[in-house]
Design a protein with these regions (language model features):
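A short amphipathic helical element positioned immediately N-terminal to and/or at the very start
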Residues: 1-8, 109
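Transmembrane helix-loop-helix hairpins at lipid-water interfaces of multipass membrane proteins
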Residues: 7, 11-69, 73, 146-151, ...
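An intracellular "coupling" helix at the cytosolic face of ABC transporter transmembrane type-1 domains
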Residues: 8-10, 95-99, 115-124, 128, ...
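Hydrophobic alpha-helical transmembrane segments of ABC transporter permease domains
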Residues: 18, 26, 48, 66, ...
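Membrane-embedded alpha-helical segments of multi-pass transporters/permeases
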Residues: 28-32, 68, 72, 138, ...
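Short intracellular "coupling" helices and adjacent cytoplasmic loop segments at the cytosolic face
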Residues: 43, 79, 87-111, 115-117, ...
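Helix-loop-helix
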Residues: 45, 144-161, 228-302, 306-307
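ABC-type nucleotide-binding domain
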Residues: 322-568
Length: 568
């Protein structure tokens, strides 16, 4: 997967490899030129000193310039690859159903798209900056070191075997630790996100200490894992350096006698030590980068999990003709993922196009679940749902979204402008269409008072608006597309009685022919509906007009009388 992403930057990658070749060539030539300069100094050959010195400086400059260019190329490739991965992951997430989202959870997905992709970006950059250079530099330095002083080949082999063994052991031990670290990082992000989103609840019930204790518990586990990893590397790195420096000192001690008897080998000794230093550099860097590479491999696996996940539901790709607004449930049974007990049980009913239908029942009866099945946010395990006589599982997503609009119980706004939020309901909505939607939702008054009207800014989650204003904008977003079926999932609960009545009057006047389904806690919200469905413990136990249900349905009558008593 990563290789395919890098292929999109093949010319930059090729240029980076050329720069890497120049850098390695420069590094391998410099000790050889240094050897020749030292030998020329011993013989007093000034002309050779100047000539070789010129080439030494030129080669060093070429390596320096190539290194600078390579840094730019590596950064370009790494940032491009990470951007492509992030876009692919986000595009994939957009196809996920609620079930897919719940499988990962939102905090987990955010960590994967930020922290994990940053880990991959860092390693891609290091790969083109350093990792590609290391094996070539290692092999070249090893060969040239043996050619320079063949008698010391065994010192090199011993050093390499010891360091490689330690590096392999370290990476094997740290893999599970890095995986656990990423999991803890997800948890701490999820806790922080949950706490910030629910800050009003936390403060209202004075639960700051409990939330802090929950956060610090995971934070301490995260710290413990991080310290373990740090301690492990703090032990391994000095040991590797001791092995490396031991090889240098051993080499110098072994050749010291040679220099006394034959001063001309001083250049060879200097060249050998330089090559040995480069070998040490490559091995130590591999060990040092092993931490990042191991983390990145785990991160890549986690990104692949997103990209390889198949959406829990698929849609017909062929756009359908416009559907009419009739709706029918036929023996629908639905159970949420990871739950055992169905939330809806064998529910059947028919709604004619243009009807206003209320859905009532006690908390947990399945009202909101029923609403979420209509736009196909979930699929039932049994039975079928039909709109305009067509099973919604055979309808394209585009057609279904144009036909059905839902106004959720909790008003969710996005940062941007009021117009941006209304156009979530219809991407090409005109100003006149937005004005009409705002008028129906009783939002025109407060929007018109704002200096920028529909271009007024909306902060994250709409925190610069009151609950009632957010709900009105949410309703406007739902009606702006003039859908065939409009669902209110208890979405008028944040409105006062007068505003709720005005919204219903506007709906009756401006959306004639639209099938309206109102999920309500208060029977007063649906008392004038053409039909009311009564749910109890996931079953449809009655349907009809208000007066008929009061007379014939004990559950409905009990809810009605209880609410009526409270109002009185």
């Amino acid at each position: 997967m990563l290789f395919q992403k890098i292929k999109a930057y093949k010319w930059q990658a090729l240029a980076s490899l050329v720069m890497t070749g120049l850098m390695v060539t420069s590094s391998l030539l410099q000790p050889r030129y240094l050897q020749e300069v030292l030998e020329a100094l011993l013989t007093g050959d000034n002309e050779a000193i100047y000539t070789i010195g010129f080439w030494l400086i030129l080669v060093a400059l070429i390596g320096l310039v190539a290194g600078g260019i390579n840094v730019v190329l590596a950064a370009y490739i790494a940032q491009g690859v990470s951007s492509d991965l992030r876009e692919d992951a986000f595009r994939k997430i957009q196809t996920f159903s609620y079930a897919n989202i719940e499988k990962f959870n939102a905090g987990n997905l955010v960590v994967r798209m930020t922290n994990d992709i940053n880990q991959i970006q860092n390693v891609v950059m290091m790969t083109f900056q350093i990792l590609f250079r290391l094996p070539i530099l290692f092999i070249g330095s090893f060969i040239l070191a043996v050619v320079t002083l063949p008698s010391l080949w065994w010192v090199l082999v011993l050093m390499v075997v010891l360091i490689v063994a330690m590096t392999g052991l370290m990476m094997g031990m740290m893999g599970p630790r890095f995986a656990k670290f990423q999991t803890l990082l997800e948890r701490i992000n999820a806790i922080a996100k949950e706490n910030l989103r629910g800050v009003r609840v936390v403060k209202s019930f004075v639960r700051e200490k409990d939330q802090f204790a929950k956060f610090t518990q995971v934070s301490d586990e995260l710290l413990s894992e991080n310290l373990y990893i740090g301690y492990a590397f703090s032990i391994v790195q000095p040991v590797m350096m001791m092995i490396s420096y031991g090889a240098v000192f051993l080499s110098i001690w072994l050749v010291a006698g040679m220099a006394e008897s034959d001063p001309s080998v001083v250049g060879s000794i200097a060249s050998f030590v330089n090559y040995l230093s480069q070998i040490i550099f490559t091995i130590v860097m591999v060990g040092f980068l092993g931490n990042s590479v191991t983390r990145a491999m785990i991160s890549l696996r986690r990104i692949r999990e997103i990209l390889d996940t198949e959406p829990a539901m698929t849609f017909n790709d062929v756009e359908d003709e416009e559907l009419e607004g009739s709706l029918s449930f036929e023996n629908v049974t639905f159970t949420y993922p990871n739950d055992e007990e169905p939330i809806l049980k064998d529910v059947s009913f028919d709604i004619a196009a243009g009807e206003m239908v209320g859905v009532v029942g006690a908390t947990g009866a399945g009202k909101s679940t029923l609403a979420q099945l209509i736009p196909r946010l979930f699929d039932p395990q049994q039975g079928s749902i039909k709109i305009g006589g067509k099973d919604i599982r055979t309808v394209s997503e585009g057609t279904l979204r144009k036909t059905v609009s839902i106004v959720l119980q909790k008003a969710i706004l996005f940062s941007g402008t009021i117009a941006d939020n209304l156009r979530q309901g219809k991407g090409d909505a005109t100003v006149s269409e937005m004005e009409r939607a705002a008028r129906i939702a009783q939002a025109s008054e407060f929007i018109s008072r704002m200096d920028l009207a529909f271009e007024s800014p909306v902060e994250e989650r709409g925190t610069n608006f009151s609950g009632g204003q957010k709900q009105r904008m949410s309703i406007a977003r739902g009606v702006v597309s003039n859908p065939r079926i409009l669902i209110f999932d208890d979405s008028t609960s944040a409105l006062d009685a007068k505003s709720e009545r005005l919204v219903q009057e506007a709906l009756n006047k401006d959306l004639k022919g639209t099938t309206t389904i109102i999920i309500a806690q208060k029977i007063s919200s649906v008392v004038h509906a053409d039909k009311i469905l009564v749910l109890d413990q996931g079953r449809l136990i009655g349907q009809g007009k208000h007066a008929d249900l009061v007379a014939s349905n004990p559950v409905y009558r009990e809810i009605y009388e209880t609410q009526k008593g409270k109002e009185e």
